[in-house]
Amino acid sequence: MLTIDINCDCGESYGAFQVGDDDGILPFVSSANVACGGHAGDPMVMRRTVRRCRDLGVAVGAHPSYPDLYGFGRRVLPLTPDEIEAWVLTQIGSLAAIARSEKVELRHVKPHGALYNVAARDLTVAMAIARAVAAFSRELALVGLAGSLLITAGHEVGVPVLAEAFADRTYEADGTLRNRHHPDALIIDPAACLAQTLHIIRDGAVRAVDGTLVPLQAATICIHGDTPGAALRAATIRQGLAAAGITVQAPQR
């Protein structure tokens, strides 16, 4: 029987600013990447999100970023490896404290935005993130783009790794994500998201924007929750996977 983890980024509101449709998307995923103060996610948002995940049986992970509230973590900041390690460790610890108070154990760490993208191609940054994860707990899984240097770094420091693919993002021929500046970077149509998800799970490949068939082995697939129609896409994917006999569940330790 085929199984797959479906994850989403969530808890990305901050104070009076509301981002994403967490209530709409969380019932359809098995893992959640919770913002923990770097780009979003104040303490009350973190607590509310952890509680919602606990009630739904969704595995909770940290979603650290560059310290960039103003830019929502989508800007590259000129930090040293030591600074990156410290910022990532601090954000993991913040969410872990709240999770512990709610009797929830963190399961994974997935960098956000620019930090995720830089770590995919820069081993120095990737190693800084991996060291932070290992310093906190070697039982935490490190989530990174399938085939990227972040996966390499996780193996190097000896933490579990989860190679990630995307249901709602398009790919370049080299296996990287198409830059969000391009109008076709996001896949909006729910049926197209489901088709890409099934292609990844069944065939271990994804079709790039230029038509190239890119080999891709993924343990977890992300659905973004901060775009219009996210809940419908998540529901379509979950229902389509069930119809195909594919079980959705968080990775087992």
UniProtKB/Swiss-Prot annotation:
Record-given protein name: 5-oxoprolinase subunit A
Superkingdom: Bacteria
Function: Catalyzes the cleavage of 5-oxoproline to form L-glutamate coupled to the hydrolysis of ATP to ADP and inorganic phosphate.
The UniProt record lists the keyword Hydrolase: yes
GO biological process, one term: carbohydrate metabolic process
Subunit structure: Forms a complex composed of PxpA, PxpB and PxpC.
Coiled-coil ranges from the UniProt annotation: none
GO molecular function: 5-oxoprolinase (ATP-hydrolyzing) activity; ATP binding
UniProt source species: Chloroflexus aurantiacus (strain ATCC 29366 / DSM 635 / J-10-fl)
Keyword set includes Electron transport: no
Family listed: Belongs to the LamB/PxpA family.
Known EC number: 3.5.2.9
UniProt keywords, alphabetically: ATP-binding, Hydrolase, Nucleotide-binding
